[in-house]
């Protein structure tokens, strides 16, 4: 079992043990985001945010093995990831948690339009996991969120396994969110970041996306 999945199950079970008044219904009300996808929006100066969220009840009970969904992907529009998360929390009447976020995927159009408005909230807000992987997607980030891997139950678990295997080859830019943010700051908006290409059931991680003056240029 992937270490991320073990940690997630441990965290969920710990909540029940440490807070005896909690039950499964209360755990279901806490949404732990695994993957964030960011695309452009039809609304001016706003983005579409996609959140991949493990379904706690399915994972703990093991019902996912019988064909039940273990992950839900929900989307919302906002001026920033914080605004988008807030809008979604109000819509679903659930709280979103990003401490266990594993991957951030930025769509090609969003990256070409400029990264400052995307990354500034990630710099200011400490709840976002700085050890998350980050990549620029060829096309829409939504395509990554729609993949249906047959090798793993959780998309975030699948992405972690791909990063781990590709990392051994040295064929991509290996850096986490914290490295990416520090690199942009120290290089005045210029850096390299890994590139990801989605298919229906898998993703290909390889090569580098070139960021210049906070915009994707190649």
What residues fall within each predicted segment?
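Membrane-proximal alpha-helical signals and transmembrane carboxylates
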Residues: 2-218
